[in-house]
Amino acid sequence: MQVGEHREILKKGDSIYYNSMAPHGMIAVGGKDCLFYAIVLNPTGEPVPELSRGDILKTLPRERDPQQRVYSKFIERKEDSHGTPLSITFKNTEHFNFAFDIVDEIAKKSPDKLAMLHIGRDKTERRFSFEDMRKNSNRAANYFKSLGIKRGDRVMLILGRSYEFWYAMLGLHKLGAVAIPAMNQLLAHDLEYRFNAADVCAIICTAQGDVTEQVDIAQNSCPQLKTKLIVDGAREGWRDFDEECKLFSTHFDRNENSPGGEDLMLMFFTSGTTGFPKIAAHNYKYALGHFHTAKYWHNVDPDGLHLTISDTGWAKALWGKFYGQWMCEAATFVYDFERFSAADILPMFAKYKITTFCAPPTMLRMMVKEDISKYDLSSVKHMTTAGEALNPEIYRLFEKATGLQILEGFGQSESTMMIGNLTGAPHKLGSMGRPVPIYKIDLLDSDGKSAPTGEPGEIVVDTRNGAPCGLFTGYYGDEEKTKEAWHDGYYHTGDMAWRDEDGFYYYIGRADDVIKSSGYRIGPFEIESVIMELPYVLECGVSAAPDEVRGQVVKASIVLTKGTKPSDELKKEIQQYVKKHTAPYKYPRIVVFCDDLPKTASGKIQRNRL
């Protein structure tokens, strides 16, 4: 079979599955559908070569003495001869606290070992050792305590890629306050909901942009928000985090009542389609669930430098810049750019000798457009991607330019990585990979039965024998949503996929219509709610539309009130209104006017038909 330049040998009985809603199913050139045709490439029936294992283990040395690693007190693992994990088990988790048990212990063992290389917007270089992180996090914990922040209090962090994020997080972990990372593009409308839903009492916020102004507006409706700390700037009514924190002691002792294990540690707001964002709650064991992400997917080198491109408001930042990487004693590279520019970041690979790299497909596409062949990427030994489906042509262009094969993975804000192409194991182009050892994964059809090979089903986690480290504990403050997602012994992800005869999973899309655009997960309901505020809008349905660069973009289908005439000016007015009343990345890039919207028998909008 051949589609464009892509060729695939089909066996007797194989079928071709095309889903126009799935990024992997996009077949178009210049915005027009292509003719789909097949060519016989193997008429003689010659044997098809077996999949070969990745050669990454030939270029990165095996770990010399893993028993000397700090994580060995909490993690046991078995590998095959290629270094692929056969099993990963956790121990001594009852009081596990990442800040104390990993970061502080590495600092004791190797105080000068590099933890993070941070590049500021002005290109200022800052190097933080694990001892720096230990001391600064102790200062932060003491500072937070002096402000009256205590165990169980909710603290939001909107810090972009500021280096203060890392030791503020560690300080909160030590104190027992619950950390809530968030994006700096949120507006007052978004913040007000989040402050009240999570009962946020304190916020640490960057001075960059206008987010502090938005916080001040939202605070008028959120009396529980008492403490506001600003980083890298000053504002009336805000305390200076940088100046005040450094005045506190670098000693913060752990005691028998220190938080850990099953205690609540972290919350993420995650988008849905039938309401405002849900709050995925994680305990202290969550950090352990990221070990395999760094060790066997990112394949980090304890003597190397890992780059994951992600804002700290995304769960992906904790996947790729924090827990797993530091458990493996690898340093992370952070560049605090204002707006992503491939031409800006590509020269840094050679300059700083970045060894492992992870980025969402959107940014990989931008790099390809910049012509990666012009840059020296020879230091990079391993590449990964997640967040949305990776276009095959991007995969091939990177392989041609670097000799590296980009390995995909899958997970959620509610979890760590569930499915992935792991080091040393076979992998297939276009596949998310196979389930990782700590998760028992299945696909269930609409009848709740395991989906046959080649058939679509919802990705579920089997928790009948207990939930794995890394899976969330439920949606905070929403027992109904928790039961909807977690019932009959399974956690239902809401994501659809199919699997082949070798057990490889292929992503289809969200069952609940969440839009994935440039790595963001955008819930239609939030956008619909804003658009419906306009007096001339009768009905509105928001859905995803395919986009070559972003994967998907927001599309708004609108029914106008009687007497309102559709026009291009009206479309622009609607787009500007959404930009002003919610985070700008959520605005509908496509606006269409309709006479009516498709609905189910019960009156629900059928977004998959928009």
Describe each model-derived feature in a short phrase.
Residues 111-114, 229-230, 236, 246-269, ...:
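Conserved pre-ATP/AMP-binding loop-to-beta segment of ANL
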